Curated annotation (Swiss-Prot):
Pfam family, one: SmpB
Protein's recorded name: SsrA-binding protein
SUPFAM superfamilies: Small protein B (SmpB)
Task performed by this protein: Required for rescue of stalled ribosomes mediated by trans-translation. Binds to transfer-messenger RNA (tmRNA), required for stable association of tmRNA with ribosomes. tmRNA and SmpB together mimic tRNA shape, replacing the anticodon stem-loop with SmpB. tmRNA is encoded by the ssrA gene; the 2 termini fold to resemble tRNA(Ala) and it encodes a 'tag peptide', a short internal open reading frame. During trans-translation Ala-aminoacylated tmRNA acts like a tRNA, entering the A-site of stalled ribosomes, displacing the stalled mRNA.
Length: 158
């Protein structure tokens, strides 16, 4: 008999749910990260926080700023700094496109997910985003509440 192929496994380490509420997501992209060994071991134990982080350009390179990967407890003197800058790996074309987009006013690069891909490599899903105004956030909340209410009504009477 034919064996079914399993869907690719993406083990999510950290998810930035706040970004989807605070920003209007325009374009997503997967980027690699330059990490040290102790950082990867710490990530394998699902410890990371990217909620307050962002990506910025310095000297033609893209860096992840303010991400938190705690020190690995079994590592000794070779441990890493938890809030250090981490280089993002993108092709030159993608980097140029993002650089041009972020140079426009109101655009920023926000990390959405940190995960292990099918090959066991740590990847970061970053998005080109524009900040939402307060009234936009309220409108999004109203739409979400109405969707939930609609689902309840359909379940009860439908």
């Amino acid at each position: 008999m034919n064996k079914k192929k399993n869907a690719p496994v993406r083990k999510i380490i950290a998810d930035n749910r706040k970004a989807r509420f605070n920003f209007e997501i325009l374009n997503n992209l997967e980027a690699g990260l330059v990490l040290q060994g102790a950082e990867v071991k710490s990530l394998r134990s699902n410890h990371a926080n990217i909620a307050e982080s962002y990506a910025s350009f310095e000297n033609g390179e893209l860096w992840l700023v303010n991400s938190y990967i705690p020190e690995y407890t079994q590592a000794n003197r070779f441990n890493h700094e938890p809030r250090r800058l981490r280089k993002l790996l993108l092709s030159k074309r993608e980097m140029a496109r993002f650089f041009n987009a972020t140079s426009r006013e109101g655009m920023t690069l926000v990390p959405l997910k940190l995960y292990f891909n099918e090959r066991g490599r740590v990847k970061l899903e970053i998005a080109l985003a524009r900040g939402k105004k307060l009234h936009d956030k309220r409108e999004t909340e109203k739409k979400r509440d109405w969707g939930r209410e609609k689902a309840r009504l359909l379940k009860r009477y439908g």
